[in-house]
Amino acid sequence: MISGGGTGGHIYPALALIERLKQRGLLDAVLYVGTERGLESKIVPDQGIDFKTLEIQGFKRSMNLNGIKTNLKTIELFMSSIKSAKKMIKEFKPDVVIGTGGYVSGSLLYAASRLKVPTIIHEQNSAAGVTNKFLARFVDKVAISFESVSDQFPMHKVVLTGNPRAQQVAGMVPNERLSEFGLKTDSPTVMIFGGSRGAPSINKAFIDAVPLLNERDYQVLFVSGQVHYENVQAALANTTLNSNLAFVPYISNMPEVLPDLKAIVGRAGATSLAEITALGIPSILIPSPYVTNDHQTKNAQSLVKEDAAMLIPEPELTGASLVKALDTLFETPEKQHAMAKAAKKSGIRDASDRIIEVIETII
């Protein structure tokens, strides 16, 4: 059984691990447990994976009357979801239960630990999530993606495995998908990407940078995010985009494009960093300031420390600062090569296999 919910950062590592278990012929059956409202309720069934739900919600940080009422309801739901989770576990009879984050994994993993079923949690970020911090005292093993997070868990349980998403993309090779966007397949290309929903600050920086980028030899593939596409289109209505620039709302099967890139500009989410380090792609990271515990900044700093990435704090992001960073990268081939080498060294390309080894030690 496996559970990870709420965001793609919790879901995709779980799916990557399931895929690897299937590839190695180690999976007789799998049940994914999520919530009805989370992204997993659509993504997981679309992969042909058995899916069941628990009713659970997160805690409110504000302690006003509404927050207190919500938190009391959360405690009530947590207690009832443990009962439901125990029933699921007894019916499915798993050899191991794995949690990749999100509130729903808290109920399932806690229930599994009480039933003495082997348990593992996976922490994708360099700052531990609330659910994983809670579960760490109950589970058998804690798999981590960043060495720096190890001191936030009981040391005797911690195993550095990396993020399963890394192994999923590690074998990908250039495939000339850039031609789909009207770009040359033999010119150095950077992708600017604000995450699956896009990022207004990154979009604005690109808009402001277009006059400068039009004059550059390198190519830019800009992904605005579907929800922001029309606004960006309107902002660029009177601006010419030269042939070295391409602008799209989204890219289907994004990992396929990555091997054709010489650099990436984007957020510092755990899944993105797992992918770019697995492939050895230099990056300019703009951590989202809107995430819990500022974990994206901590994620980014782990790569900056290894000289595998550059960092632009969002308040310092402008069209000019973006182009300056890109010019530094593309006009200094030795720096670009060194960053690519450092990025690849930082990646853990056998992450799923490492987690499978951990599974085999506890079942």
UniProtKB/Swiss-Prot annotation:
InterPro entries: GlcNAc_MurG, Glyco_trans_28_C, GlycoTrans_28_N. Keywords: Cell cycle, Cell division, Cell membrane, Cell shape, Cell wall biogenesis/degradation, Glycosyltransferase, Membrane, Peptidoglycan synthesis, Transferase. Pathway: Cell wall biogenesis; peptidoglycan biosynthesis. One of its GO terms (molecular function) is undecaprenyldiphospho-muramoylpentapeptide beta-N-acetylglucosaminyltransferase activity. It is an enzyme of class 2 (transferase). The keyword Nucleotide-binding does not apply. This is UDP-N-acetylglucosamine--N-acetylmuramyl-(pentapeptide) pyrophosphoryl-undecaprenol N-acetylglucosamine transferase.
